Amino acid sequence: DWWQEQLADVPPLLELPTDFARPAERRFRGAWIWRSLDGEASARLRQFAGSRQATLYMLLLAAFDLLLQRYSGRDDIVVGTPVSARPQVEFEGLVGLFVNTLVLRTDLGGAPDFDRLLSRVRATATAAFAHQDAAFERLVERLQPGRSLARAPVFQVMFNLVPMPAEPLEAGAVSFRPGRLLDHGVSTFDLTLTVGEQ
C-alpha cells in the first residue's frame, strides 16, 4: 500500500538540539511562542508560492523542512500535519470534529536548491492528501515502528496552517472573534509550528 511504501524504514527520531537530555518518558510540558507576519510579507509569500505552482502551505512546509534539516543534520525529514477527516458523504451531517494526521516525509538529500525542494514538498503533500483516508492509528498498527515512552511514534514534529477569519463570525446573538489559541503549557510533540492565515 502507498503509506507502507512511503514510510518504509522511517527514521525513529528527529533529534533536534535542546538544552536538556530527552527524558525517559514524555512529560508533555511545553509553551507557545507567537510571531506574526504583516500583510505585505504574507502577500509576497503567496505570490512566490503561486509562481512555482505551489500553495502557501507547501511553501511554508518546505521552509520548515529546511530549518529542521539544518538543526537536526538529517536529510530525511518526517513531519505530521492534521487534516479534516470528513471525506465520506456519511459524515457530512454529523456534528463534531473529525481529524486525521498525515505523515509528510521529505527527502532533502543531494542539497536541492529551494525550487527543487519546493517541488519535492509539493509532490509529497499532494500524494499524502490524496491518500488521507488511512487513519494514522491504523498506519502505526501496520507499520509497527519502534516504540518508546520518550517520543511520539513515526514523527515528533507537527506542522499546521490554520485559516483564521479576519472578521468576527456571527451566529444569531453570538459573535465569535478570532484570537490566539490558549497556551495550556502542554505539548504533544517536540515542536509544533502552527501558522494562522488571514
Language model: regions and residue ranges:
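Adenylate-forming
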Residues: 4-9, 17-23, 30-198
